[in-house]
Design a protein with these regions (language model features):
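A short, Lys/Arg-rich alpha-helix, primarily the initiator
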Residues: 2-27
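Conserved hydrophobic/aromatic packing and binding residues within compact polymer-binding modules
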Residues: 21, 35-36, 46-49, 77
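Residues within the helices of the helix-turn-helix
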Residues: 22, 33, 64
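The alpha-helix within a helix-turn-helix
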Residues: 25, 36, 67
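Recognition helix of helix-turn-helix/homeodomain-like DNA-binding domains
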Residues: 40-56
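Short, basic-rich loop-to-helix N-cap that marks the start of a DNA-contacting helix
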Residues: 53-68
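Short C-terminal boundary/hinge segments that cap the last helix of small helical domains
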Residues: 71-82
């Protein structure tokens, strides 16, 4: 595992999820600051999740908060293919 706790096997999944979050945020006309505030997290943490070159694992609570803030179900967020 890497220092962020993401195994190589899951690396691409976290990259895809970060890209999906970023794309949905932009489609909704939200800045990182706005989404981070609605999802109860720091902008720097959100930025790290969205960045494809910084693989960052995160909790289910964070996933649920992001999904709620993006007005999408967690399962739809996980199944988003953008």
């Amino acid at each position: 595992m890497s220092k962020e706790g993401v195994s190589f096997k899951n690396r691409d999944r976290f990259i895809q999820l970060g890209i999906a979050i970023s794309t949905l945020r932009k489609l909704r006309g939200m800045s990182q600051d706005q989404l981070a505030e609605k999802a109860n997290m720091s902008r720097s943490h959100l930025s790290a999740i969205e960045a494809p070159n910084m693989i960052r694992s995160f909790s289910l609570e964070t996933l649920f908060n992001l999904a709620d803030a993006l007005m999408i179900t967690p399962s739809d967020l996980l199944n988003t293919s953008l």
